[in-house]
Amino acid sequence: MAELVLYRRRFIPDEKILLKDDKVVSVSDDAIVTKWEVLTKRHDFTHGMSCYYIKEGFKVSKFLDDNDNIVYWYCDIIETEKDGNTYTFNDLLADVIIHN
């Protein structure tokens, strides 16, 4: 299988970002699991994992600190566009944050 290309599109601000450093952990017809480092340095978390539930239209992310402690869970409502091995995840601006 060809390597996946992942993008995140936001509408506010209007941007489409290649998730070039995300590592794909698993792929199925229903879900894509990734692990990642932050794009911009932060003091509260440094890395995490995300599961994109493609058919259901949401993403659940686990945000972790330097010691792998869970800082919070983050749920995004998304719409997924697929073109070959390229996925664009459109953030529909309805989010839920669950703090530990």
Which functions belong to the PLM regions below?
Residues 18, 69, 88-90:
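A short, structural micro-pattern
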Residues 23-24, 50, 93-97:
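Short, surface-exposed charged micro-motifs
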Residues 26-29, 68-69, 98-99:
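A short, structured loop/turn motif at beta-sheet edges
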Residues 45-83:
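Aromatic- and glycine-enriched beta-alpha-beta binding-site module
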